[in-house]
């Protein structure tokens, strides 16, 4: 049996909701036209109206989701237009799910972090000279630790950390934890340069000369990208 493409489901779901919505409207109109408004009929009408309200809410939620996924895919295209459409969709969907799971991360901040961490490549297989791997540049030792929280069976650093879905799950969990401890600026500093330096920096009211030179450039670079993506519309 042929497996359905997730990209196809992305398009098909709103169509299903719309079809149900218009069918429900037809049923309501038919009921009003051909039946007396007895108590039983009014009760059924009320139930139908509630169902319609639920459908409208579902359509609204799905519309927001589709907007964010389309936006993320357009960002990916800027940096890596050779990534297959299904892979782009799956990455975008995982980023959106992470933004729902972690209230202190939004889609734009996650995308900004990935853009900078991957050196503007959005390549799932990218590796740094220091040994960090994947979209969110996770060190293998950190990956082993985070994999336990995500119920990911660790096989090898290459297999797990170059998997973009696993990488995003682990990276966003780690970033969210750091942001909850140190705020956005401090969380980004800790993600890049370690918690000790970030903690000292926050305690010193973000004074110059405490963070590593790389981290001093890293934090404002991601904040700039974050602002750019927040202002970006399709």
What are these regions (language model features)?
Residues 1-89, 227-234:
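N-terminal secretory targeting signals
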Residues 55-234:
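Catalytic glycan-binding domains that act on GlcNAc-containing polysaccharides
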């Amino acid at each position: 049996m042929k497996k359905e493409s997730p990209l196809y489901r992305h398009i098909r779901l709103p169509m299903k909701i719309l079809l149900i919505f218009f069918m429900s409207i037809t049923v309501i109109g038919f009921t009003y036209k051909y039946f007396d408004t007895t108590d039983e009929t009014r009760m059924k009408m009320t139930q139908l109206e509630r169902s319609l309200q639920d459908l409208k809410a579902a359509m609204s939620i799905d519309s927001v989701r589709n907007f964010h996924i389309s936006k993320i895919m357009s960002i990916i295209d800027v940096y890596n237009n050779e990534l297959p459409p299904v892979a782009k969709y799956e990455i975008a969907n995982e980023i959106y799910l992470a933004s729902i799971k972690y209230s202190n991360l939004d889609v734009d901040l996650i995308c900004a972090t990935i853009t900078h961490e991957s050196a503007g490549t959005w390549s799932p297989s990218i590796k740094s000279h220091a040994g960090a791997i994947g979209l969110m540049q996770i060190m293998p030792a950190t990956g082993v630790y985070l994999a336990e929280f995500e119920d990911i069976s660790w096989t090898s650093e290459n297999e797990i950390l170059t998997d973009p879905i696993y990488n995003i799950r682990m990276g966003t969990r780690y970033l969210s934890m750091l942001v909850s401890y140190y705020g956005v600026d401090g969380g980004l500093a800790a993600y890049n340069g370690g918690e000790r330096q970030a903690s000292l920096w926050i305690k010193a009211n973000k004074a110059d000369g405490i963070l590593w030179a790389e981290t001093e450039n890293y934090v404002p670079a991601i904040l700039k990208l974050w602002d750019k993506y927040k202002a970006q519309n399709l």
